[in-house]
Amino acid sequence: TKKPVLHDITFSAKRGETVAIIGSTGCGKSTLIQLIPRFYDVTEGSIKIDGVDVRNYDLETLRNKIGFIPQKTILFSGTIADNMRFGKHDANEKELIEAAKVAQAYDFIMDKPDQFDEMVYEGGTNMSGGQKQRMSIARAVIRNPEIYIFDDSFSALDFKTDAILRAELKKETTHAIVLIVAQRIGSIMDADKIIVLDEGNVVGIGKHKELLKTCSVYKEIALSQLTEEELA
């Protein structure tokens, strides 16, 4: 029999909380968050939103609660505004501008000749990786979901943009649960709760400073990525 990708995982997240998930490649981080919108279903145990098992929600109702920002951004041919409205079809201009500002996309959009009416090529081939990620984040912000799920969605951003974007998101998501999967400790150091996965198991749960002392897997990742000053 095949061994499950994930086992013995228990955690909770409250509104207004940021919960981060980190671990080595192939440890099950993405699988864990893909269980929430039911891209997969659990084989044992359950995942509950507001006390209700996700399998008991109508799929559309469930997914309307969630803003899922995948690792690879999917953009289609159409204007920037069309791509952003994929998150909310009836979004007005004010909502587009607000979401773009939170996602740190506003400046590069305004630099385009046609701004929000600028055409995006199929797959977003006329945008950089970082611009595509910010478009994807803007699309989720415009939905104003109850749960944000970022699947390594800051990886193409430089550290400065990443930090500003997360600070803006924090202000915007006080009513929501934010789940972040990351490879980069810099993106999650200020999370309320960090879950460390190793080979499908939880090997640590806590804040950054605690985990540096108590979790060898986390400390190892931190040592490979952070400077002495950042570790202090």
State where each predicted segment sits.
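ABC-type nucleotide-binding domain
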Residues: 1-232
